A protein has these predicted regions:
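ABC-type nucleotide-binding domain
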Residues: 1-170
């Protein structure tokens, strides 16, 4: 059992296989549980629809997946209501706008499957922009700073500090 207060940052530390990722999967209801509760704003997560939960919780993984499309469509992913201005605002917030605007086609630049043409840090910044665009109340970072290239490491650390501000972060 544990509690996380609104706006608090906590970390789960343990060896491989100790259950860190399992806890994340429980938060996101990828796994269902039979005993206990996970409450968000005093409400059991089982009472939220998957769509409601996804709007409340932003997930950034160690190895973000980018999809075939454009830079903008990867930030917008499944959030069709986002405008171009909101996409750019999210990219600026996480300091991705600089490298995106240097691409020949900017936000319309093509992205190959898995984002092979981008550095690991650039892929992570795009994943941060995708997450922040949904304005989640809770951030879940699953080793989000692992395997980052030195060129974008500082940008990622600054972006993470900004992203965590005012949000519960796990």
């Amino acid at each position: 059992s544990f509690s996380v207060k609104k706006g608090q940052t906590i970390a789960f530390v343990g060896s491989t296989g100790s259950g860190k990722s399992s806890i994340i999967n429980l938060f996101l209801r990828f796994y269902e549980f039979e005993r206990g509760q996970i409450l968000i704003d005093g409400r059991d997560i089982k009472d939220y629809s998957q769509a409601e939960l996804r709007r409340k919780i932003g997930l950034v993984l160690q190895d973000p997946f980018l999809y075939h499309g454009t830079v903008a469509s990867n930030i917008q992913l499944y959030q069709e209501q986002l405008t171009r201005e909101e996409i750019i605002e999210a990219a600026k917030f996480v300091d991705a706008h600089g490298f995106i605007s240097q691409l020949p086609q900017g936000y319309d630049a093509p992205v190959t499957e898995r984002g092979a043409t981008f550095s690991s840090g650039q892929r992570q910044l795009l994943a941060f922009a995708r997450t922040i665009a949904t304005k989640p109340k809770i951030l879940i970072l699953d080793e989000a700073t692992a395997n980052i290239d030195s060129e974008t490491e500082e940008l990622i650390q600054v972006s993470l500090r900004k992203m965590r501000r005012g949000r519960t972060t796990i």
